[in-house]
Amino acid sequence: MASMSFALNRFSGLSSKTTLSADFDPSSRRSFLPPTRVGLKISSAAESEPDLSVTVNGLKMPNPFVIGSGPPGTNYTVMKRAFDEGWGAVIAKTVSLDASKVINVTPRYARLRTGSNGSAKTDVIGWQNIELISDRPLETMLKEFERLKKEYPDRILIASVMEEYNKTAWEELIDRVEQTGVDALEINFSCPHGMPERRMGAAVGQDCALLDEVCGWINAKATVPVWAKMTPNITDITEPARVSLKSGCEGIAAINTIMSVMGIDMKTLRPEPCVEGYSTPGGYSYKAVRPIALAKVMNIAKMMKSEFSEDRSLSGIGGVETGYDAAEFILLGSNTVQVCTGVMMHGYGHVKTLCAELKDFMKQHNFSTIEEFRGHSLQYFTTHTDLVKRQKEAVEQRKAEKRGLKSDKDWTGDGFVKETESMVSN
């Protein structure tokens, strides 16, 4: 990708390590609450197609749909397929320095279906995995990153990285990954299972003191944009998000999977997924988690809007299956929307459906660009106390209107008799 480096301080709204594409337009910088333009569009023969392109932390993508870190980004072949099908960006499966310590088991997935336990033919609404990070040698993954960037120089490739609580190890991993030409880093502070004893993944993301220290190491070394991926398995997700941003991260990605036990087999009485008769809690994803993910994203977006400059980004994750699902995340402030389990369910070509549905939504509401509606729905969230107050005022207003006209200008010719009657007291 043809690019130029900007060395601007935080007051300019861009990090010193942000690399911008040559056609980056500073006027496209994000705003959480764009002007309200909601309303049905009147079709025109000359109407133009909505523009799905986004520029995030200086990285230009053809659309906001990003392959989330996981099985869909395990190797060169599948990541190439994602680019060929039209995904806006690809986040590779998480890598670490020593893949020999990563040992996966089979089976490692389990499904939740609608209906009673044991239903075999109903719709899948939830997905659990006990899969670890990449078990492929780091050298192999790095060669494939480099190959992808040579073949697709204008497409965005993001490396997901995770390492033990060791400054030297983190610095080595970041240095080696960046040498391949990847466009950004996503730091996995959120994997809910596997290797917690090595202080990896959620073991760091749930400890703000550790998180602050590790983010400091990473951001002192990194020269490309850094996104911190949040765990939902915490009381207040805005706390680690705030720490990550204060420590220098350009963006937040949320959420990773939710710690869960998928269920018990009613015949064997063993938990699922069952490996040699045993199991372990794993990460829960797909459609059923979307309401939880939306709430987490909403809270992070509101925090970011009130406390940080507009150059920081937010990548929404959790249960996205349709373009309309994606629109919900964007309406709550997300710059990009990640899809992982959805790709495992529908394949890489599903991005075409996602783009078509998102464009359909935009046409319905007369939106030309993503920025025109990003963050629009944040303004409608308030406290329960305020809801009570608003409803009380609305009820009083309706009662007042029933009691009669408020002003001479409110009289109408057609309803004159009824309007007169409405103001009679006996």
Curated annotation (Swiss-Prot):
Pathway: Amino-acid biosynthesis; beta-alanine biosynthesis. GO terms for molecular function: dihydropyrimidine dehydrogenase (NADP+) activity. The modification N-acetylalanine is found at A45. Expressed in roots, leaves, stems, siliques and flowers. Highly expressed ion dry seeds. Pfam families: DHO_dh (PF01180). Residues 1-44 form a transit peptide. It catalyses: 5,6-dihydrouracil + NADP(+) = uracil + NADPH + H(+). Its main location: plastid. InterPro entries: Aldolase_TIM, Dihydroorotate_DH_cat. One of its GO terms (cellular component) is plastid. Belongs to the dihydropyrimidine dehydrogenase family. This is Dihydropyrimidine dehydrogenase (NADP(+)), chloroplastic. It comes from Arabidopsis thaliana (Mouse-ear cress). The lineage of its organism: Eukaryota, Viridiplantae, Streptophyta, Embryophyta, Tracheophyta.
